[in-house]
Design a protein with these regions (language model features):
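Structural and coupling elements of P-loop NTPases
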Residues: 1-593
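A short, hydrophobic C-terminal helix/tail in secreted or cell-surface proteins
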Residues: 594-598
Length: 598
């Protein structure tokens, strides 16, 4: 199945945890015929929350992709976790998305995290639709939620729907752009006349939409000033321009759980969100010309694709999610990995529907899919034509903010623990694992308690090893508060040539871990011995004189000394520097402090 870019929409589904993102994805998949029945998060039966951890926690933890067909258009849904600890998943998914669908509850307030995720999409230039969910609940407050959004995004917000409420619940909706009303039925929705009591609201919303449309196009703006109105087609055209330029954010409403308003949403995604061949601001470096170029989504051009996520399964191996930005990725082809600077053999190409993979012959420009068992490819890598080498910018992930020590419950399984955690670090670039040489501990870092808890459980599930978490031991450093000078003289006489090295060194506090400099005049210490002095000092940094901790924040300046034409050697000056270090730091008001992380 190869579909061209004009018939593809790549939509990241975003929002805070618990707002109904996965349920909305499930409803869209059901309406598109991708599933026979609409699964539920609470039952663990949804397409995009397929991992055992997600099923047990009743929340999205990993990025998942699933496609559906709607009106001859392929919609690739990218379901992103909403919890803060999994922010890295958002960075991955939005790299592949052409637009975003923000899901928020109809609670009359701006939800936690909504502002940051909207702002992030706007910075990336990702067109956005807002879906106010939960309109089946009693006292659902659509207009209160719209007002809360307008307080932050007044100049961009464009509500296009009016809910038809009965007994506090949404029973239908009016599309002000299309000037049509619908009542929800068991099979979807049926068109009805616009209720008389809502006609004034419809007219007011239409007037606002005309004004918004006019602001997105100079020709429309001139006509609007002259006549005070626009045709329906002109209004729709102006709104679409505004969405594409992220100047306009349309707002819709419904109930994902009850599958109400979802068909209207699918229609608007096809009508208003960018076609995959419309996004022309994708930049990459042309490696031959050494310049930044704009990658046009031309299916006939040489291949340019990027891996945006990696999943490693202990049984089936590595699965690389990718988006084709240009050309076509074909099963059985050989491509160039611009990051690893090596060829990569492509086996079978797949499209994704949750955990299910469907084999295809190729992915055309604008499409999203996956390839398994790539040898040298990691998240963020560029795959391209070997005769047209380009490289996309790396995906920038937040650095770990919480660090814990981890150990095996059973003695002798530490290597198994480290290997399992290292595999997870290949999947999640916000997670780090290292062995601390000073404390002997395995240290892991992540975005928060929830992420670390999930990763530990995942290692147990995948690799059958139990672990325990503890606070990391503190690795201390020694540093100095004052300036001091010292000399070191290494003199040794044996039967033949002796050993002689003599140096005078000034030690000062500094902001860098270590700086070596020299101020020797008159050749008191020949230049060929400067590296030996520096090496002797660097080797001495490993163990300070106060408590044996590594020394940091030290500047050492070699300013004088002496040498012997016959007996001096690099070894002698290295030893002399070590003696000066030991003597000098005794007089520098040493103190210890916890080791800062890079």
């Amino acid at each position: 199945m190869s579909i061209t870019g004009e018939n593809i929409r790549n939509i990241a589904v975003i929002g805070h945890s618990g707002e109904g993102k996965t349920t909305l994805c499930e409803a869209m998949l059901f309406n598109g015929g991708a599933v026979d029945r609409q699964g539920k998060v609470m039952d663990g039966t949804t397409v995009t929350d397929f991992d055992d951890l997600e099923k047990s926690k009743k929340m999205s933890v990993y990025t998942a992709c699933a496609y559906l067909m709607w009106k001859d258009t392929k919609i690739n849904l990218i379901d992103l976790p909403g919890f803060y600890d999994f922010e890295g998943e958002r960075h991955e998914g939005l790299r592949a998305a052409g637009g975003a669908l923000l899901v928020i509850g109809a609670n009359g307030v701006l939800p936690i995290g909504a502002e940051s995720v909207v702002d992030y999409c706007l910075r990336l230039g990702k067109p956005l639709i807002i879906f106010i969910n939960g309109m089946d609940k009693e006292n659902a407050d659509y207009f209160g939620t719209v007002r809360a959004l307008k307080e932050k995004y007044a100049g961009k917000l464009a509500p296009i729907q009016i809910p038809i409420m009965e007994n506090g619940k949404m029973q239908g909706c009016i599309n002000a752009l299309q000037e049509k009303a619908y009542r929800f039925t068991a099979d979807g929705a049926e068109e009805i006349p616009i209720p008389d009591e809502l006609k004034a609201q419809v007219e007011e919303m239409q007037a606002n939409l005309m004004e918004t449309a006019a602001e997105n196009d100079e020709v429309l703006l001139d006509k609007y000033f002259e006549s005070g109105e626009l045709t329906r087609e002109e209004t729709i055209h102006g709104i679409r321009l505004g969405i594409a330029s992220v100047n306009t954010i349309p707002v819709m409403a419904g109930s994902a759980l009850q599958n109400r308003g979802v068909i209207n949403l699918l229609n608007e995604i096809v009508a208003y969100m960018p076609q995959a061949n419309e996004r022309t601001n994708t930049l990459a470096t042309d490696l031959a010309a050494d310049k930044v170029v704009n990658i046009q989504p031309d299916p006939a051009a040489p291949l340019a694709a990027q891996v945006f996520k990696t999943v490693i399964d202990p049984y089936s191996g590595k699965l690389s999610y990718l988006k084709v930005f240009r050309g076509a990725l074909k099963s059985g082809s050989t491509v160039w990995n611009a990051n690893a600077e090596r060829e990569e053999r492509i086996g079978q190409v797949y499209v994704l529907r949750g955990k299910k993979t469907e084999p295809v012959s190729e992915l055309s420009a604008g499409d999203i899919g996956a390839v398994n068992k790539l040898g040298v490819t990691s998240t963020g890598d560029t795959l391209c034509d070997i005769n047209a080498k380009v490289k996309f910018d790396a995906i920038h992930f937040p650095k770990p903010t919480l660090f814990m020590a981890v150990s095996a419950e059973k003695k002798g399984e530490e290597d198994k623990v480290f290997a399992g955690l290292s595999k997870l670090a290949e999947e999640d670039y916000t997670f780090s694992v290292e062995k601390n040489a000073e404390t002997g501990e395995i240290l892991i870092g992540g975005q928060g308690d929830t992420q670390i808890e999930m990763l530990v459980k995942k290692v147990k599930t995948r690799y059958g090893v139990d672990m325990k978490l503890t606070e990391p031991k503190i690795a201390y450093r020694e540093t100095i508060r004052a300036v001091a000078s010292a000399e070191g003289k290494y003199k040794k006489q044996t039967g033949g040539h002796g050993q002689y090295g003599h140096c005078k060194i000034r030690f000062e506090p500094c902001g860098e871990p270590f700086i070596f400099d020299e101020e020797v005049v008159g050749g008191a210490v020949p230049k060929q011995y400067f590296p030996a002095v520096e090496k002797g000092l660097r080797e001495s940094l490993v163990s300070g004189p106060l408590a044996g901790y590594p020394v940091t924040g030290l500047k050492a300046v070699l300013y004088d000394g002496s040498y012997h034409e016959v007996d001096s050697s690099e070894m002698a000056f290295k030893a002399a520097a070590a003696l000066a270090f030991k003597e000098g730091l005794k007089n520098c008001l040493l103190y210890t402090s916890p080791s800062p992380r890079d």
